[in-house]
Amino acid sequence: MDESSELGVLETMETLTELGDELTLGDIDEMLQFVSNQVGEFPDLFSEQLCSSFPGGGSNGGSGNNSSGRGNNGGATDPAVQRSFSQVPLSTFSPSAASPQAPALQVKVSPTPPRATPVLQPRPQPQPQPPAQLQQQTVMITPTFSTAPQTRIIQQPLIYQNAATSFQVLQPQVQSLVTSPQVQPVTIQQQVQTVQAQRVLTQTANGTLQTLAPATVQTVAAPQVQQVPVLVQPQIIKTDSLVLTTLKTDGSPVMAAVQNPALTALTAPIQTAALQVPTLVGSNGTILTTMPVMMGQEKVPIKQVPGGVKQLDPPKEGERRTTHNIIEKRYRSSINDKIIELKDLVMGTDAKMHKSGVLRKAIDYIKYLQQVNHKLRQENMVLKLANQKNKLLKGIDLGSLVDSDVDLKIDDFNQNVLLMSPPASDSGSQAGFSPYSIDSEPGSPLLDDAKVKDEPDSPPVALGMVDRSRILLCVLTFLGLSFNPLTSLLQWGGAHNTDQHPYSGSGRSVLSLESGAGGWFDWMVPTLLLWLVNGVIVLSVFVKLLVHGEPVIRPHSRPSVTFWRHRKQADLDLAKGDFAAAAANLQTCLSVLGRALPTSRLDLACSLSWNVIRYSLQKLRLVRWLLKKVFQRWRATPATAAGFEDEAKSSARDAALAYHRLHQLHITGKLPAGSACSDVHMALCAVNLAECAEEKILPSTLIEIHLTAAMGLKTRCGGKLGFLASYFLNRAQSLCGPEHSTVPDSLRWLCHPLGQKFFMERSWSIKSAAKESLYCAQRSPADPIAQVHQAFCKNLLERAVESLVKPQAKKKAGDQEEESCEFSSALEYLKLLHSFVDSVGFVTSPFSSSSVLRSALGPDVICRWWTSAVTMAISWLQGDDAAVRSRFTEVERVPKALEVTESPLVKAVFYTCRAMHASLSGKADGQQNSFCHCERASGHLWSSLNVSGTTSDPSLNHVIQLFTCDLLLSLRTALWQKQASASQLLGETYHASGTELAGFQRDLGSLRRLAHSFRPAYRKVFLHEATVRLMAGASPTRTHQLLEHSLRRRPTQNTKHGEVDTWPGQRERATAILLACRHLPLSFLSSPGQRAVLLAEAARTLEKVGDRRSCSDCQQMIVKLGGGTAIAAS
């Protein structure tokens, strides 16, 4: 035995050990069971090789001379036998009688690649036999090779000597064959694929050797046994079938029939050949041959062999290679390839997982695909039914049709549940779940009979009427009341009676005129009867239209489940931004409720006309009271009437919310543009049904529906139906209550006069794709009220800043006193804006059950930040240092949405606020830090002027830019005046440095550039140009001319439009007076007392404006001039 052979054997056994440890037989059985169950559903994906059955059979043959022993035909295989060698130990046997000893025999075995060997189980079967004699013959067995790997010779001598002992080898599929006493040397040729490479030669004096294999042949030896050399060459077979036959001495061919689970039948012709290998032969000439079997060192009870027999050395550990090992290796290799392919399909090529995990994932994935397929089939079925009923059967309630058809489909579907459902991958899976869902997900409520109640069929009143039938009934009623055929019938009846009895009256007749004695009673009774009949007819029509004609859907019924499925799907589509899919689901909801949208102009005209009539009738309290009484009497018991009334109100509420959401999508432009009549129709439907729902709908939702209707009429109909928009707006305000207690915070701005004025002036627009704004957070794109609220917040911010940078108009043309100062107006606007901004996040979706639809997730932090920044600037201008410090903590926290935009205007405002805060610091470096922040803000402001044309809200951008530029120039002026005042105390003259002048000139250049596109900036240019000349110490003549431009008063009559924007305001005039009185020489003033008069006027103006810092400086200058108290009092 060479070393390479031993190393190869060891490597092969290690590979098989690793494969056995990684994949268990339980996983393989589970996968095979699952694949076999899927053959019916996926015939193209699975083959039926492992599922096919093989017929079984066996044949027994033998001689008639010797019938002392027969083998048992094992047609069926015991499952306990089909196990590995490690699980089935070999039973021991005990000798029953002593036998003569024989010399040891050696057997040469030619092994093949290793495979798992069949199960060996020796059983003691004592059978007395006559004494045997030994002869020597030679038998050569030469089977055909199909695949022949490299052959290795392994010496494995095993000798068993027993007088009366039968040795039995058990394997599946037993078959017996009885030989004749006379056996001649033959040659066995057989077409197989694999033959085990080990044989056992057993020498017995008088005994029987039985061999049971998958294709097992039982051989009964004759009394005379002779030793014949047998040469067996192994072959490669696909299964563990083995063939054993005996040799007859007469030379006749013997046919051995073999049955195997993988092969139908094998037939081996037996021929004689030259004797080459010695075997055991009985005394009467019978040749005994055995099947090749594997008996490992740890499987054979060698210790029970009689002591007289010489035992050879045990085989080495690396020599356990059998044909079954080869079969098992190929079997596992095939399984491994398929499992790797499954892993690549399910989890990808890069995933790493054990084979059992791959099988579980594959089973779960197939279950998931089945679940999705089932859901898609059900949704497709419902959508097809709804589409078909919309086109063909508009006058029939779709709910009942969906109910019956869905029941039929579900019954058909439930019959195939077990066929379509694969076996559970986890033994702990609960059976209560739907067979189409994975283990952790409950089944669909549409197929779960426990969740959907079997409600009785709705009564005829729940079917409803189409709008064409309603209009037709109204027209017939109107025509009947107009022509009044009952009056003609009564008159015809009275005339007929008069003709029959012309002179039978009780009164007198003068010139053929009869004077009846009945009086007023004769004509009053027919009139009362006529009005009574007409009233009954009209009331019946109202009951038919408003009570019996309304479709009602029972809760927990099949149509109700379908409605809620599509309603929730519409919520998810709206949250994801898929507005087309949401609109389709909402239309399906309306179809299920029996309120399909009109598809033709005739249907649209009838629906619109009926909704106008219905809205008019609902405003009549008498009609509502009569309908309520009739409705209560129509039901048998009060409890039944109350229950049906609740169901009717719930159905009306659901339909109203669906109409309202569709109307919002049409207004915001998320759907293809339709006609104005279609929008008015949806608005009226939502309003009518919401009012019918009464207490079932929230007051805030009812207010929102009326406001949306007003917006739709305002945007789509324009000035034609503007009065209707005002009516619905007033109606919404009346629903809020006298003290606006029921109005939600998100709609409170419409109750304010400024909000109403803004809404009615239509200075807003609803866009389908709202642009991102720097001044407000993004609102819900499908909510028109949120978009109008966003526009109103920006309008308030613009008004607040405009009151600071633009002059205020006078109350009257002849009134010399101007309005209140810009600071108070700006603060009032900012206060309103702050209150309206905080209430943005409390608005809910009309579908209150959905938590994913919100107009905003909280207050508008962006608009709040701008409010805090402008308020801080006003506080700094007023000289309120405490308010500046408190507001700076809010301004310092810039929202992330503004940081992401990287807007230079936002950075300019932020650094300006930091500069104002640093200027209040009492430290030595406070002014230097303020100057550095001013430089950074100046650079960002210049950048914003270059990109301002490409941003949204251009008017608001110009106002903010002008305000920021004015703040920077005012801050630079304040810093210069502080340094100049400190120098004057020391008796020195202070002139600004070149860096300060360069920064001031850069901001002044930004102001001039802004004035070219925004005219109100001119009112600031002259004042700041005069300031920079004073800082540089330039000639005072030109400086005085520039200041005169701000000091001069101008008449308001005969002024062109736009010139008022360039005039300086009150604060600019007071600031110019302070600069002139402080820095200009006295010779530039007209009279010696003019300076004190101008300072007194400036002090009154600054006090009125609220600029406490500048007013204090003015008072100090008046005191220095002397006599300032008397001048101020005058």
UniProtKB/Swiss-Prot annotation:
Membrane topology: Multi-pass membrane protein
Name of the featured protein: Sterol regulatory element-binding protein 2
Stretches the record annotates as Disordered: 53-133
Knockout or disruption consequences: Death around embryonic day 7-8.
Biased composition (Low complexity): 94-104
PROSITE patterns reported for this sequence: BHLH
UniProtKB keywords: Activator, Cholesterol metabolism, Cytoplasmic vesicle, DNA-binding, Endoplasmic reticulum, Golgi apparatus, Isopeptide bond, Lipid metabolism, Membrane, Nucleus, Phosphoprotein, Steroid metabolism, Sterol metabolism, Transcription, Transcription regulation, Transmembrane, Transmembrane helix, Ubl conjugation
One example of a Gene Ontology biological process annotation: negative regulation of cholesterol efflux
Lumenal topological domain residue ranges: 492-522
Membrane topology (Cytoplasmic): 1-470, 544-1130
Biased composition (Pro residues): 111-131
Biased composition (Gly residues): 55-64
Region (Interaction with LMNA): 226-480
Source species: Mus musculus (Mouse)
Domain bHLH: 319-369
Example of a GO cellular component annotation carried by this entry: SREBP-SCAP-Insig complex
